[in-house]
Amino acid sequence: MQTPKLIRPTLLSMAILSSMAWATGASAALVPPKGYDAPIEKMKTGDHNFSCEAIPKPYTDKLVFRSKYEGSDKARATLNAVSEEAFRDATKDITTLERGVSKVVMQYMRDGRPEQLDCALNMMTTWAKADALESREFNHTGKSMRKWALGSMSSAYLRLKFSESHPLANRQQDAKIIETWFSKLADQVVSDWSNLPLEKINNHSYWAAWSVMATAVATNRQDLFDWAVKEYKVAANQVDKDGFLPNEMKRRQRALSYHNYALPPLAMIASFAQANGVDLRPENNGALKRLGDRVLAGVKDPSIFAEHNGEKQDMTDLKKDPKFAWLEPYCSLYTCSPDVLEEKHEKQPFKTFRLGGDLTKVYDPTHEKGDKGDNDGS
């Protein structure tokens, strides 16, 4: 039977709409970069010496903490030993959780012991059920702790969620509890760090955007992904023609250190965006590459920064290998020079809990070095 002519366009339109809907649905699921799908290395059985450390008490109080730069001038470049100790003490349970989740997830992805998975999930569900870190009472240091903790946990969780070993297949209730909590925290982080004046947007905002990007992929929320990309673009447009970040240059003797500290979240966001078909490398004429090149040059010759802001640079932090974990995503986005690759290989593996653990395992697994550095990173 011949289809009436009037109906043909309708059927064609339906077919087109159907194919568009399928394509949209197929591309809608957010994913991390390729290495996050790595399987568990070896499912170990039998005797073991793993024991899950006590879960720190969920932090449900107001997020008001002293700054380690308390009493410093606007440069925020001079540490206050007394207030730093008070800060470390007040935030100990939060950082213990961050480090614990990262470490145990790394151990589980290596050994595959059920006890390790139980431990990691129990840490996160315990805090989730307590509505930890959700306080609307906070100061700058407090909201900073919230976004750091979220980024640490959600990026470690990605290793579990996307592994081709599917460790969460039989833990869907735990996954739901954790992801619902991450989602709530991300909404608050977006609120905490939105609509700041440009002079107030610095590495803290970049780290906030990273925590939201990791959570976007963990919870498959496009709105969070879009916010992180938007914040990245603001950051990229702060990079000047010479590769400097004016707001980080204000940090005087710590300017180079803070330029380096700005790179991990930005490189990770760009890498995650790339995995989802969004190429951020051209933003502001290749700002990320310009920033990375400037920092690498500055590490070799700190006088570049000293000449720019008149301060001899404090290189203490830059002697710690995990501070260069950004080289993993960076060298996946760009073709790094042989000397940069050599330096990267010397410093590997890069394990830093604020980026979810072992980035070498994700980005450059052929240069992984077992459990070396499991307790390192910041």
Curated annotation (Swiss-Prot):
Q: Which GO terms describe its cellular component?
A: periplasmic space
Where in or outside the cell? Periplasm
Respond yes or no to whether keyword Membrane is given for this record.
Answer: no
InterPro entries, sorted: Alginate_lyase, Alginate_lyase_dom, Chondroitin_lyas
Q: Which UniProt keywords apply?
A: Lyase, Periplasm, Signal
* Record bears the keyword Lyase: yes
Q: Which Pfam families match?
A: Alginate_lyase
One GO BP on record is: alginic acid catabolic process
Regulation of activity:
The monovalent cation sodium enhances activity but is not absolutely required.
Q: What is its EC number?
A: 4.2.2.3
Catalytic temperature dependence: Optimum temperature is 42 degrees Celsius.
Specify the domain of life of the species encoding this protein: Bacteria
Activity response to pH changes: Optimum pH is 7.0.
SUPFAM superfamilies cross-referenced by the UniProt entry: Chondroitin AC/alginate lyase
Q: Which GO terms describe its molecular function?
A: poly(beta-D-mannuronate) lyase activity
* UniProt catalytic activity: Eliminative cleavage of alginate to give oligosaccharides with 4-deoxy-alpha-L-erythro-hex-4-enuronosyl groups at their non-reducing ends and beta-D-mannuronate at their reducing end
Sites where the protein binds substrate: 67-68, 140-141, 258
Supply the enzyme class, top level.
Answer: lyase
Residues of the signal peptide = 1-28
Q: Which NCBIfam families match?
A: PRK00325.1-2, PRK00325.1-3
What this chain does, per the entry, is described as: Catalyzes the depolymerization of alginate by cleaving the beta-1,4 glycosidic bond between two adjacent sugar residues via a beta-elimination mechanism. Degrades deacetylated polymannuronate (polyM) alginate from P.aeruginosa more efficiently than non-deacetylated polyM and alginate from M.pyrifera. AlgL from P.syringae also degrades its own alginate, which may indicate a role in cleaving preformed alginate and/or in determining the length of the alginate polymer. May serve to degrade mislocalized alginate that is trapped in the periplasmic space.
| Record-stated family | Belongs to the polysaccharide lyase 5 family.
Record protein name field? Alginate lyase
Q: What is the lineage of its organism?
A: Bacteria, Pseudomonadati, Pseudomonadota, Gammaproteobacteria, Pseudomonadales
User: Encoded by which gene?
Assistant: algL
